[in-house]
């Protein structure tokens, strides 16, 4: 079995969610509606990688995605990328797939990656 991790930019994501491959996947890394919303996000640049999906043959076995955003900063505005989804098939959790996906995410957005946990905000409020 061959594993492949595919990254999707804005344009590639649009093609992907309209593809026959997307329609026949056993599981999808993003819904059509969310993919279309990502494509139309005004903060999304053409070269932003929005999603990394891991496939073994034609089966989805993991994915990680981001949501581009703009926040206020000392110098005006700063472009950031929110971690928006992260999943690995249970049978692949003993391997290093989660680490591989997270590494690609950090490598791409190390200075602009934001992660939040609203449950922790309620606990420590």
Where do the protein language model's features map onto the residues?
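Short amphipathic alpha-helix that is part of the acyltransferase structural core
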Residues: 1-55, 82
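Short, flexible loop/turn elements at secondary-structure junctions
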Residues: 9, 56, 68-70, 85-90
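Short amphipathic alpha-helical segments, especially helix-boundary/capping motifs
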Residues: 9-16, 62, 78, 97-102
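A short linear-motif detector with a strong N-terminal bias
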Residues: 29-33, 45, 61-66, 90-94
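Catalytic micro-motifs at enzyme active sites that drive phosphoryl/nucleotidyl and oxygen chemistry
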Residues: 41, 51, 67-74, 96-102
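Short, solvent-exposed loop/turn segments that connect beta-strands within catalytic domains
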Residues: 45-46, 57-59, 72-77
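Acyl-donor binding region in acyl/amide transferases
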Residues: 74-125
């Amino acid at each position: 079995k061959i594993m492949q991790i595919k990254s999707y930019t804005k344009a590639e994501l649009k093609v992907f969610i309209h593809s026959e491959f997307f329609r026949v996947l056993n599981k999808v890394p993003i819904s059509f509606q969310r993919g279309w919303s990502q494509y139309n996000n005004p903060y999304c640049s053409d070269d932003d990688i929005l999603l990394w999906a891991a496939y073994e043959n034609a089966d989805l076995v993991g994915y990680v995605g981001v949501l581009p955003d703009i926040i206020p900063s000392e110098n005006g505005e700063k472009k950031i990328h929110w971690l928006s989804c992260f999943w690995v098939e249970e049978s692949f959790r003993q391997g290093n797939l989660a680490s591989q996906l997270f590494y690609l995410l950090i490598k791409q957005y190390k200075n602009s990656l934001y992660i939040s946990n609203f449950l922790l905000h309620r606990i420590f409020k």
